[in-house]
């Protein structure tokens, strides 16, 4: 997965 996509998914999981 692209780094930005992974970061987005992780960010949403934190929220």
UniProtKB/Swiss-Prot annotation:
<comment type="function">
    <text>Cysteine proteinase that hydrolyzes basic proteins, such as histones, salmine and clupeine but not milk casein. Shows a preference for basic residues at P2 and P1 positions.</text>
</comment>
<keyword id="KW-0964">Secreted</keyword>
<protein>
    <recommendedName>
        <fullName>Miltpain</fullName>
        <ecNumber>3.4.22.-</ecNumber>
    </recommendedName>
</protein>
<dbReference type="GO" id="GO:0005576">
    <property type="term" value="C:extracellular region"/>
</dbReference>
<dbReference type="GO" id="GO:0016787">
    <property type="term" value="F:hydrolase activity"/>
</dbReference>
<keyword id="KW-0378">Hydrolase</keyword>
